Curated annotation (Swiss-Prot):
Domain called ATP-grasp: residue spans: 9-236
Catalytic activity: succinate + ATP + CoA = succinyl-CoA + ADP + phosphate; GTP + succinate + CoA = succinyl-CoA + GDP + phosphate
Its job: Succinyl-CoA synthetase functions in the citric acid cycle (TCA), coupling the hydrolysis of succinyl-CoA to the synthesis of either ATP or GTP and thus represents the only step of substrate-level phosphorylation in the TCA. The beta subunit provides nucleotide specificity of the enzyme and binds the substrate succinate, while the binding sites for coenzyme A and phosphate are found in the alpha subunit.
Pathway named in the protein's UniProt entry: Carbohydrate metabolism; tricarboxylic acid cycle; succinate from succinyl-CoA (ligase route): step 1/1
Family per record: Belongs to the succinate/malate CoA ligase beta subunit family.
GO cellular component assignments: cytosol; peptidoglycan-based cell wall; succinate-CoA ligase complex
UniProt GO BP: succinyl-CoA metabolic process; tricarboxylic acid cycle
Name of protein: Succinate--CoA ligase [ADP-forming] subunit beta
Cofactor list: Mg(2+)
Keywords, comma-separated and alphabetical: ATP-binding, Ligase, Magnesium, Metal-binding, Nucleotide-binding, Tricarboxylic acid cycle
Native organism: Mycobacterium tuberculosis (strain ATCC 25618 / H37Rv)
NCBIfam families: PRK00696.1 (NF001913), sucCoAbeta (TIGR01016)
Amino acid sequence: MDLFEYQAKELFAKHNVPSTPGRVTDTAEGAKAIATEIGRPVMVKAQVKIGGRGKAGGVKYAATPQDAYEHAKNILGLDIKGHIVKKLLVAEASDIAEEYYLSFLLDRANRTYLAMCSVEGGMEIEEVAATKPERLAKVPVNAVKGVDLDFARSIAEQGHLPAEVLDTAAVTIAKLWELFVAEDATLVEVNPLVRTPDHKILALDAKITLDGNADFRQPGHAEFEDRAATDPLELKAKEHDLNYVKLDGQVGIIGNGAGLVMSTLDVVAYAGEKHGGVKPANFLDIGGGASAEVMAAGLDVVLGDQQVKSVFVNVFGGITSCDAVATGIVKALGMLGDEANKPLVVRLDGNNVEEGRRILTEANHPLVTLVATMDEAADKAAELASA
């Protein structure tokens, strides 16, 4: 889960990472009131989960509360790369002597953690990596040893930070690592991390991504969910612990196992080329269990998408056998009743597949078409969706 900057700075405050005071608002009047309360020049910053805010006019310096009001009026409602600005962070402006870059992230390719640090902050880090790679330090972090002050100082040193700020920067870097671990983050990024004229180190920007797989031990993270901006079908799926991502096609997809579902998306997209450009409507992995309740929840989510014209249920029976899956489908259709009103193409394979097919055949549900192979099923689902 990506956080808004103001949410990330709440975690900064929780873990004593130095930053500038500020508050969030959704009105121009609120921005003026916060600026008045701070009593100094402020930055008015669009809250969107995308980079490039400054270039798009989403970050403005306000010398007075009235300036904050005017900037807020212009920024609210702004479209930044498809993200509409609905909230603003109004934070105290800071005098800046130098700008640096610091991040911790999960390095999936090397199965470790990575610290990245550069004296070239305040610009796109991809640009630094491309034009000045020698100025960007990439330091592997041992997950067991972590980051103490000595190692944090080494990270800053490898990032070419000036000698006079190494010790101060090390303290902040160590605190950012503590946050990264304690909050189960996959990314903590500060750009810029600045040195003030009096040699303080401040995190002026904040970007944090939290690992949704750790939600079970991070109940406090639920408050960060932007439910108003989240697709209601994705919210419904999450309530049932289903892995669902809405796409823009017409064939609903239900499968067990992420790899199988990804393969199903591919074959449906390929088959859809012959049927007017039909595409998959979603990714939905029901996991290892395909009980009637789980299948009903999955069908309820997929059928709730008005774009869906047909549904492809693609299940490989393993620990959960095909007869259990078939029974789940039949019961799920009974539980949903009239809400199940779109054709289903079902392909079963694996453990006890013949019994599973027999159950579906004998049920003889008018919405269900049983198909033997994945390619044939994808073609049938695409054909039904294009009809």
